[in-house]
Amino acid sequence: MSDGQKLTHIDASGEAHMVDVGDKAETVRVAVAEGFVKMKPETLALIRDGNAKKGDVIGTARLAGIMAAKQTANLIPLCHPLMLTKVAVDITEDTGLPGLRVEAMVKLSGKTGVEMEALTAVSIACLTIYDMAKAADKGMEIVNIRLLEKSGGKSGDFRRQES
């Protein structure tokens, strides 16, 4: 494994530790992640029409994703607590699944990236959709949660290339 591929959360003795970012330069960091909730067409219609028993599925899931991004350091042991400057969660209908596509964009000016915050936002938004619609469709699937892009920081930019 080259230095560029070294696991940063593992020290020389193989123990997990929180990375010291104190000497790193502050840069603007942005990460975008996505995930999907596949469901029956009838369940998608129920959500679209605002008829889910628990209320506004999309609005609630959007808020849950935003809240989750802000709590990432409390959920993932070695993540730094961050002062996020922007979290946006967009949930759109994808009739091809059928289901919902969840995208989260997280931004800050700081010393460490926000990939985990974007992925956490997507994960919790998807789980919230499942929770709020499970009475209608227990067979829903949460799929393809992944980082789409990140910018800023020493490791440079990343953009997922689709084949």
From Swiss-Prot:
Gene3D superfamilies: Molybdopterin cofactor biosynthesis C (MoaC) domain
Biological or metabolic pathway of the protein: Cofactor biosynthesis; molybdopterin biosynthesis
Signal peptide: none
Name of the protein in question: Cyclic pyranopterin monophosphate synthase
Role summary: Catalyzes the conversion of (8S)-3',8-cyclo-7,8-dihydroguanosine 5'-triphosphate to cyclic pyranopterin monophosphate (cPMP).
EC number(s) from the headed UniProt entry: 4.6.1.17
Source organism phylogeny: Bacteria, Pseudomonadati, Pseudomonadota, Alphaproteobacteria, Hyphomicrobiales
One of the Pfam families matching this protein, by short name: MoaC
